[in-house]
């Protein structure tokens, strides 16, 4: 798929039948269109397209929006904006890390923009932060256009591995990590494997007893069929605790995104009641204070509407 210039009336689609039409840049506007949310689209007014490129894996675009600052788009789908990225990055990171005492070794799968790294670095107990991102272009673009997000790469505890996250995990010795955070895009294209049962089995093997995983888990308004499958797989694989939490992100489809929070068999993990507060003051001057996460919103994120609660609490039991 080639993303059209916003001064062109092309709708952003190619003629290749194998390449789905998943976005368009019409005069002055970017519209996010995807088969994952049929019948609806979210649009942002474009001031200027800052970058367009095609990596070995996906189309990459950055544009300056009128209301949400700079926007990172992969294969036509918004990944982050300067205005609301905090709601996603802080929650996917601190929900797991604030639920266990003194995490020391953390692995991030995906997350090439560096935002999760930034948030992991707030935890002073952490000694090693590994990240495996498949697309080098995402890392380079983030460092160039989103320095306040990519600041996470400046932490000396960070070890960057460019490659496939599934293959990386298979080579990790069993019980290596206290926490694994899977910051994936939607389950199409290069991220599809990150939503499948064998991947979760590999994560469980890489975690210590009582270790935790946090993974992007779609929207309860749009993807309950995907969430059902994820929950069923996680209940089968993770013998500790399995929970679904969510947060609001205005520029994500339906305005929200969910997370699976799971732990391996071992020391009990109560995700709903954080026990490991962040020493935010010690990092505030370097990466800025928290904008979204706090202990109250941590606990509230596990409260589900009735229709989702019925499905999630019964699936796999």
Swiss-Prot record:
Pathway: Amine and polyamine biosynthesis; spermidine biosynthesis; spermidine from putrescine: step 1/1
Active-site residues annotated for this sequence: 183
InterPro entries referenced in this protein's UniProt entry, alphabetically: PABS (IPR030374), PABS_CS (IPR030373), SAM-dependent_MTases_sf (IPR029063), Spermi_synthase (IPR001045), Spermi_synthase_euk (IPR030668), Spermidine_synt_N (IPR035246), Spermidine_synt_N_sf (IPR037163)
Primary enzyme class: transferase
Keywords: Polyamine biosynthesis, Spermidine biosynthesis, Transferase
Binding-site positions, putrescine: 88, 183-186, 252
SUPFAM superfamilies: S-adenosyl-L-methionine-dependent methyltransferases
Molecular-function GO terms, alphabetical: spermidine synthase activity
Entry-linked NCBIfam families: PRK00811.1, speE
Name of the featured protein: Spermidine synthase 2
Native source organism of the sequence: Datura stramonium (Jimsonweed)
């Amino acid at each position: 798929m080639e993303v059209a210039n916003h001064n062109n009336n092309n709708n952003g689609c190619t003629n290749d039948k194998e390449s789905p039409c998943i976005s368009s840049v019409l005069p002055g506007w970017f519209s996010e269109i995807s088969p994952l949310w049929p019948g609806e689209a979210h649009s942002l007014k474009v001031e200027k397209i800052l970058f367009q490129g095609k990596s070995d894996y996906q189309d990459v675009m950055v544009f300056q929006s009128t209301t949400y600052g700079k926007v990172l788009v992969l294969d036509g789908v918004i990944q982050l904006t300067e205005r609301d990225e905090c709601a996603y990055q802080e929650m996917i990171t601190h929900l797991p890390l604030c639920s266990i005492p003194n995490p020391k070794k953390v692995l991030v799968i995906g997350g090439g923009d560096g935002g999760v790294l930034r948030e992991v670095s707030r935890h002073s107990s952490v000694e090693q932060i590994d990240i495996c991102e498949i697309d080098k272009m995402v890392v380079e673009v983030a460092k160039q256009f989103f320095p306040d997000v990519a600041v996470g790469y400046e932490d000396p505890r960070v070890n960057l591995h460019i490659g496939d996250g599934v293959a990386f995990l298979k080579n990790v010795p069993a019980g290596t990590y206290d926490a694994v955070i899977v910051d994936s895009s939607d389950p199409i294209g290069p991220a599809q494997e990150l939503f499948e049962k064998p991947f979760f089995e590999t994560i469980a093997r890489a975690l210590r007893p009582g270790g935790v995983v946090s993974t992007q888990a779609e929207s309860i308004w749009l993807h309950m069929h995907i969430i059902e499958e994820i929950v069923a797989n996680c209940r089968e694989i993770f013998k500790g605790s399995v929970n679904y939490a969510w947060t609001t992100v205005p520029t994500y489809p339906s305005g929200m995104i969910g997370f699976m929070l799971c732990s391996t068999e071992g020391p009990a993990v109560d995700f709903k009641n954080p026990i490991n507060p962040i020493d935010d003051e010690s990092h505030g001057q370097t990466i800025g204070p928290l904008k979204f996460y706090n202990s109250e919103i941590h606990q509230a994120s596990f409260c589900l509407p009735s229709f989702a609660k019925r499905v999630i609490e019964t699936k796999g039991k």
